[in-house]
Amino acid sequence: GLDGVLDVRNHLKNRIAPANPKISKNVSRLLQDVTGELSKLPGIGRRTALRLAIHLLRMEPDSVSNMTRSIDRFRRDIKYCKLCNNLSDEEICPICADRERDHTTVCVVEQVADVLSIENTRQYRGLYHVLGGVISPMQGIAPSDLKIDLLIERIAQGTIREVILAISTSVEGETTLFYLLNRLRQYPQVKVTSIARGIGFGDELEYVDELTITHALMNRREIE
C-alpha cells in the first residue's frame, strides 16, 4: 500500500542522502580536518564543507594565498565603530560619518548582518546601533554584555529623535525589546518605534527578504 511505498522511499532517501553525512575513516585525515573546520562556519554542513575543501584544493595557489591573507587582514585590522558598534575599517564607520544621512533616527539591531540586510533595501537613510546580540539568561548573556549603555549615551546627547527597534521576534528578542523600552522611558522626547511584525516569530533579519524588511520598516508602529 501507500505506507509501504513511503517506507521504501524514506529508506532509499536515508541511504542516498543521510541527514548528517560523515566522512569515512578511510578518507585522508587532512581532508577530514579541513572539512571539520569549515563545517564550524554557520550555515555550512558537512556535505558543503567537503565540497568547499575539494574546491580549495583545485584553486590556483595564488587565489588560496589571497584568500588567507584577506582573512588574516580582516581579523587583524577590522574595527568596531566607536559610535554604533558596526564593523568598520576606521574608528567611525561610513554610515555614521555620512552627513547626508538622517542623524536624528537610529535603528537598533542585533548583529552587523542585520545592518547589511536593511542597507540592501535602500529604503532607510538613518543611522544604526548594533547591540552585538540579545539578552539570553540561558546562554549567560546579560544586558551588560551588549552595547546598550553605548546606545543610551548616544540618546542622552539629545540629537536622536526616533529609535527604531528592529529586534528579532524570538523569546530572547522580546526580552531585549522590553528591557530597551524600560531604559528608554527616561527620554520621553524620543519616539520609540518597532518594526511591523510581518516577520515571523523567531525569524532573524539576516534571513528575511528585502521586500519584507522594507514593509516592516515602513509600517513600524510607535510604542507608548
What are these regions (language model features)?
Residues 1-20:
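N-terminal targeting leaders
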Residues 25-31, 40, 50-115:
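Cys/His-rich Zn2+-binding cysteine-cluster or related metal-binding knuckle/ribbon modules and their
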Residues 81-84, 95-97, 124-126, 130-153:
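Basic, flexible Lys/Arg- and Gly-enriched helix-loop patches that mediate nucleic-acid binding at interfaces
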Residues 105, 109-110, 160-172:
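Acidic beta-strand-to-loop metal/phosphate-binding motif
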Residues 121-128, 136, 182-189:
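A short alpha->loop->secondary-structure connector
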Residues 172-185:
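Short Gly/Thr/Asp-enriched flexible loops that form oxyanion-binding sites at enzyme active sites
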Residues 189-193, 204-224:
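Conserved phosphate-handling catalytic cores of large alpha/beta enzymes
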